């Protein structure tokens, strides 16, 4: 059983947590359909046990305080982003706990702007990293971090220990990559289908969606044309 833990804090982005964790939960469901035991146990860790209000206005429940957790019991530790992260960038007890956790967990990663928390802990020094496109400039302030702001995520099976993802829903793509590495591509694809993912995107794909380009056009006729083209690539477009 792999124990997957995600930090939560006031004003955290709820989808940074629920998106990736649902991927792991759905992987358990796929295994159950095959008569196999669950592969993952999921945990939320806060500064203290109890409800934590997200930026969406609803609360998630931290089952335990992170300071009480032995990182060696965790397979994967995820650090999400959100408006509340600014209060954590100089939260020395948390940053020190993350430093101590890093060599003891099998995998440590961030979702969205959670990369800034890892950067402030010094854990991204000498590593490539990405984050939400709106926070790339802030991450570039850390000179020892190789910022690759176009990437969807930086997870690689060849270097699986430390990784980051781009904004919000990119955390789902990151979690699918982790599931694929753990349980195989068929399970990851089954989860993507179950979650009605449009694409299972690789980590080196840009986080800017070409499919959203038509939405940026203010000319309705041009917008309609740009929407029509990718749906009709088999036709003569000359």
What does each model-identified segment do?
Residues 155-194:
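Conserved anion/nucleotide-ligand pocket segment
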Residues 39-41, 105, 126, 144, ...:
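A generic structural signal for alpha->beta connector loops
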Residues 1-108, 117-120, 149, 176, ...:
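Extended, subdomain-level signal for the structured scaffold at the beginning of enzyme domains
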Residues 125-154, 190-191, 195:
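A conserved active-site-flanking secondary-structure segment within enzyme catalytic domains
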Residues 108-109, 130, 148, 163:
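Structural detector of well-ordered beta-strand residues that form the stable sheet scaffold
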Residues 87, 128, 164-167:
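Glycine- and other small-residue-rich loops at beta-strand/loop junctions that grip anionic moieties
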Residues 115-116, 123, 134-136, 152-154, ...:
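Short acidic/polar capping segments at secondary-structure boundaries
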């Amino acid at each position: 059983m792999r124990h997957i833990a995600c930090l939560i804090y006031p004003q955290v982005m709820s989808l940074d947590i629920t998106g990736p964790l649902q991927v792991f939960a759905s992987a358990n469901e796929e295994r159950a359909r095959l008569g196999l035991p669950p592969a993952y146990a999921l945990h939320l860790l806060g500064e203290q046990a109890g409800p934590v209000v997200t930026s969406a206005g609803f609360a998630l429940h931290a089952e335990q305080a992170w300071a009480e957790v032995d990182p060696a019991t965790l397979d994967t530790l995820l650090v999400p982003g959100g408006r509340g992260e600014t209060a954590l960038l100089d939260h020395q007890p948390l940053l020190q706990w993350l430093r101590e956790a890093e060599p003891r967990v099998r995998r440590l990663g961030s979702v969205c702007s959670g990369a800034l928390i890892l950067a402030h802990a010094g854990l991204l020094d000498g590593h490539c990293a990405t984050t939400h496109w709106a926070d790339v400039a802030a991450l570039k302030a850390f000179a020892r971090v190789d910022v690759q702001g176009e990437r969807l995520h930086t997870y690689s099976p060849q270097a699986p220990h430390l990784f980051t993802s781009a904004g919000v829903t990119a955390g789902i793509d990151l979690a699918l990559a982790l599931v694929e590495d753990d349980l195989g591509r068929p399970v990851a694809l089954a989860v993507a289908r179950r979650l009605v993912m449009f694409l299972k995107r690789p980590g080196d794909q840009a986080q800017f969606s070409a499919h959203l380009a038509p939405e940026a056009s203010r000319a309705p006729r041009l917008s309609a044309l740009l929407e029509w083209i990718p749906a009709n690539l088999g036709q003569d477009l000359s």
